Amino acid sequence: MNEIKTLNKIGAITLSIDIIKQNKKSWDTVAHHFDGKDALPGYGPFAQTEEELGLFGEVSNKKVLDIGCGSGHSLRYMAERGASELWGVDLSETQISTAEKTLKDVIHHLFCSPMEAEIGLPKQYFDVVYSIYAIGWTTDLAATFKLIHSYLKPGGSFIFSWDHPLYAHLKSRNGEIYLDGSYQNEGVTQYQNFKGEEAPVIIPKRKLATYINELIKADFMIESVIESDVSSGFDGASEEISDRYYSLYKARRFPTTMIIKSIKG
């Protein structure tokens, strides 16, 4: 990604129609880069997998909702594990179209919408709500967590993964990793050429504590916070020095991914 600038702290990031419209347009442009990527059983680049962490447990006969369902491959994974109902929400019409094809032979319910929006999904209905590398796109984290809380049955689980909030500040040059910018300043970061395309996007920038505190405010009980180790699937793999944003070289020194599991009381 080609970083343009990080804006100054703007306080609580509220729902922005302009940001959502721009991100939606750009995601429709770059969706083909993500077909089958950032999907279960994976949690993120080089991160431990569901097979290693076992956060979902048994999902047979459970109703599941995928926030930021992308190409539908995480829902496909849930179907293969016996989930009874598959629901998904994604901002991108192109992603939803791909997900329809991925899930063509199983019953599913897909909606093209921002995750921040109230779109009439059933309340106190789902056993599990999850989001794999998507939750950080929300322009209103508090509203999104409150909606997710409302979708879950009492005792239901909410599991999400996202870039470790400090990882974006770790740059690599000639094998040396250094801190770039201020982790303290929340706000938004703009990228002009997402995935090398003419696809400008705006991504909120938040601290790890912000995610945790907003979960608490939404009445979730936090069960687990994971700063993921490198998956055992990369055991023995060589780590060539790389200046790429995601690299095994960096991942073995700092977690690319945070994973949080919380419960509705």
Put a short name on every predicted segment.
Residues 65-118:
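Class I SAM-dependent methyltransferase SAM/SAH-binding core
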Residues 162, 166-168, 196-210:
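Acceptor-substrate binding/catalytic loop of class I
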Residues 201-225:
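Short alpha-helix
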